[in-house]
Amino acid sequence: MVNYTLSGTALKAVFLHSDALYLSIISLLLVSFAIFFCFFSIMMTVYFTISHLQEVPRYIFFAHLLINDTIYITLGLVSFFSSAYLIYFPMPISYMIVTISSSAFKVSPYNLAVMSLERYLAICFPLRHSGWCTRQKTILTIVAVWIIGLLPNVVDFIILCFSVQSDYFSVYCLSVRSVFIKNDAQETLRFVVHSLGFSLVGLIIVFTYIKIMLVAIKLNSGKATASKAGKTVMLHAFQLLLCMMSFSYNLIEIYLRKYLYMLPMINFYFFMCLPRFISPLIYGLRDEVFFRYMKRIMLCKTPRTFPNSDST
């Protein structure tokens, strides 16, 4: 997880300069989270109410993406307020929070990669798609994605255990990643994993987009479907770019922190939370099926039978 520790000295400076500005940003953060959680709840209601959606691979992946982002944002808020208000947790709980949130951070781009591959199979191999992309295989893919996301944290934990005293896990600490960095190998591991992971995901998205658009150019029939799938993959690329914005957090804070005392908090909102707040908007509201049933739920209407649609 990207380090966003707000020191006690910086926090005091915030209050001395402007309590109103500080409270405004906190309020904006909480209101944004409330709106995001509202959309999340409506979309999950649609997903679990319409049984057919639970059999379609891309909707399963999308539901998983929403759940994963919600986990990440929630634990990120816990870590942020732990740092800002100096709230201490038992070491094992703090480490668990950091581990799950950092794994969720890695899982988001991996999920975008498999969503792009699913669209690639649907357009380029339509006859085999139903056999390759079953509900069971989709669930197994999600499990595999989480295993890949957790493996670096397992290695990190082993390195940590060899780098600290035996009583290290018996104390209370802030729930931030910097507390658990005790060896340069941990930072090296994190850099390598993020670099390779995001590069591979980027290559997969570019590859699937090119393949899908080539099909759209060659086909006279079904061109609209392939074009829609290409636009969907481009949305995944945009979501990946939003995820990568998190890496600019440390660079901006290093060079600009001395000029803006509110920078840690502003950085946390715009580069850690906001990209995931808008995820339901750039994908969920664009999907015709989700939009139709979300509107029915918000208007308190009973959903009708799900149409056999393959909108992207």
Model-derived regions: residue spans:
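Loop architecture of class A 7-transmembrane GPCRs
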Residues: 2-13, 153-197
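Hydrophobic alpha-helical segments of membrane proteins
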Residues: 74-78, 151-154, 158, 195, ...
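Intracellular signaling interfaces of 7-transmembrane GPCRs
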Residues: 44, 49-57, 124-139, 206-233, ...
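Seventh transmembrane helix
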Residues: 245-312
